């Protein structure tokens, strides 16, 4: 399992504006163990994602 910021089809992090429930539901939908809104980046962060999940690994948001 991996941890990280899930991305959309354009390699952009999911913005959350401190909404932990949104991120938790998003991450659970991606089969993660849990998730929360990381306030420093205002982006969802998932813990325990499947190894093949799409997470931010660098590169620009298109």
From Swiss-Prot:
One of its GO terms (cellular component) is extracellular region. Gene3D superfamilies: Knottin, scorpion toxin-like. Keywords: Calcium channel impairing toxin, Disulfide bond, Ion channel impairing toxin, Neurotoxin, Secreted, Toxin, Voltage-gated calcium channel impairing toxin, Voltage-gated sodium channel impairing toxin. It is found in: Secreted. It holds the Pfam family Toxin_3. One of its GO terms (molecular function) is sodium channel inhibitor activity. Disulfide bonds join 12-61, 16-37, 23-44, 27-46. Residues 2-62 form the LCN-type CS-alpha/beta domain. Expressed by the venom gland. GO terms for biological process: defense response. Belongs to the long (4 C-C) scorpion toxin superfamily. Sodium channel inhibitor family. Alpha subfamily. This neurotoxin acts on sodium and calcium channels. Potently inhibits native voltage-gated T-type calcium channel activity in mouse male germ cells and weakly blocks Cav3.3/CACNA1I channels expressed in Xenopus oocytes. In addition, significantly slows the inactivation of activated recombinant sodium channels (Nav1.5/SCN5A). Has the structural arrangement of an alpha-helix connected to antiparallel beta-sheets by disulfide bonds (CS-alpha/beta). This is Kurtoxin-like I. It comes from Parabuthus granulatus (Granulated thick-tailed scorpion). The lineage of its organism: Eukaryota, Metazoa, Ecdysozoa, Arthropoda, Chelicerata.
């Amino acid at each position: 399992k991996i941890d990280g910021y899930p991305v959309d089809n354009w390699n952009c992090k999911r913005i959350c504006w401190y909404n932990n429930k949104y991120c938790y539901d998003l991450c659970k939908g991606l089969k993660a163990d849990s998730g929360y809104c990381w306030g420093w980046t205002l982006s969802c962060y998932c813990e325990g994602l499947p190894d093949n999940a799409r997470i931010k690994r660098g590169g620009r948001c298109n």
